Amino acid sequence: ENFYKFPLDEFQRDATRVLIDGHSLVVSAPTGSGKTLIGETAIMNALMRGKKAIYTTPLKALSNQKLREFSKKFGKRKVGLKTGDVEVNAEKAEVMVMTTEILRNMLYSNAAGGEMDKRLDDVGVVILDEVHYLGDSYRGTVWEETIIYCPSNIQLLCLSATIGNPDDLSGWIEEVRRSDKSDEKLCKTLVSDYRPVPLNWFYSMKPNRDWPGLGYLLNSRGTQMNEELYPFTEEGMRENFSRYGGEQESYYNYHNNNRRENDQKSMRRRLVPHVETAVGQLISADMLPAVWF
């Protein structure tokens, strides 16, 4: 708490105790609930024990973001980056940020009986951010193999906002990484449903005189779609067609014709903004920085 100059909440204190005790940990909590702070605590705990830390993300953009954040927190000389495209201070860093694929590849050589990657020397903790990617049909094996091949002496911290079965994941991690026959629980679970920062959904369209381009996707109660978007629904288009004298049968003919590929492309040209337009809307709304998928 002295490091952060503000009191930690109960959820963060519980996580800190688990990490200091040396256990691996699965954390499932909404965005904005303090998972990043828990990750930073794991890093500090490793550094204080004279160990190194590895922090993985699924995206290069997120890795770059974490490099900036951790450089401010721990100092540029202590933090490095490796994404496949870029290497920053990779040989000397005590805190390495990388994509999960990079770490998996580092672990492969050791699993295949080769010489242990020197960058894993003295690593005390591996932090897997967005660990729910385990369930991804295309990339999930990367997270699975990373957990399986990670040496059992290295502490694991798995972070996610959306994982649906954290206890099952914790049990599986313990099963594949246990190196003894004791009954002690080596991987624990912490779950929180509290969302201190509200999650808001927005839509972005090309602006014109009828709509501003960027707005809330849901109504003020969060129960239905924003009324501004009603004219673009099938029901809204049918009402508009009838309002201007169209018959229902004619509407269905019109609707089916608009299913054609050229009309869908026309709809996209009219409504979907260019990247520059969408970024300009985010700038005007003071919603940067952002990650574009």
Model-derived segments and their meaning:
Residues 1-3:
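Conserved adenine-nucleotide phosphate-binding loops and their immediately adjacent elements
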